[in-house]
Amino acid sequence: KEGALENEKTMNGKNAAVVAINPKTGQILTMIGSRDYFDKEIDGNYNVTTALRQPGSSFKPFIYATAFNKGFTPDTVLFDLPTEFQMTCNAYGKALPGYSQSNCYMPQNYDGKHRGPMTLREALAQSINIPAVKLFYLSGLSDSFKTSESMGISTLTNVSRYGLTLVIGGGEVTLLDMTSAYGVFANNGIRNKYTGILKVENSEGKILEEFSLNEKEILPKNTALTISDILSDNKSRTPTFGANSQLLISGYDVAVKTGTTNNNKDAWTIGYTSSIT
């Protein structure tokens, strides 16, 4: 709570939520739905962990995982340059005669800069938007959507509704689903669906329900390890985040991805080790 209150002072973050899951079992270790359950000013009795929110760039690893499954590598190069993705618009993002300007799509990077050729490692580590949208297009919207769904994202029902904006957080997901899905990366490609119940007994002590491990391989181990390696690569993210950012946790090998929604309304940080997400 102290950290959340400090965030309100420094970043105008009026509320906060956190989920922690053991990726080896899927067991929920912590679920805090708001900063203060009794604070009516922030609707404290509302569980933000199960609310639909846009994930921003924290959705990108699902698209990169799909690409790595298809033969792309961390050393594959894409160009971070102004790019119009709609064929009915010109290279400068203006609609061609007879077509609507609203259909044009020329994504921007968060800082407005363009870095030219970038490896996929650099692009993901620094969370650069334009290469991510290009990779989403090249990997296939449908296949990328299936990857996120198989990893535990349950709220995106129609990829055509979002189009290319999905890679930079255009859909709505829950923190609980996102934490669980990142657990697949943490657990070397193996998914354990989240659970908050270990055992249910009746008044006579008879066990009605009991937790049992139910593992399912979702990603090739090498794909999961590659994503984890990039998200823990401080050198690759340094040009954007700096060498000593808050993403660097001294003494621990932690993979971290951030996400920020439009107008900084929501800020996500999802981090994991092999034992906690």
Cite the ranges covered by each PLM segment.
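Glycine- and acidic
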Residues: 13, 42-50, 129-131, 158-166, ...
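A penicillin-recognizing enzyme superfamily signal
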Residues: 1-10, 18-22, 31, 38-48, ...
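Proteins synthesized as precursors that undergo proteolytic processing into mature forms
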Residues: 34, 39, 68, 75, ...
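Mid-domain, small-residue-enriched loop/turn segments at the edges of structured enzyme/sensor domains
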Residues: 92-94, 98, 102-107, 140-180
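Conserved catalytic neighborhood of penicillin-recognizing serine enzymes
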Residues: 24, 72-144, 191, 202-233
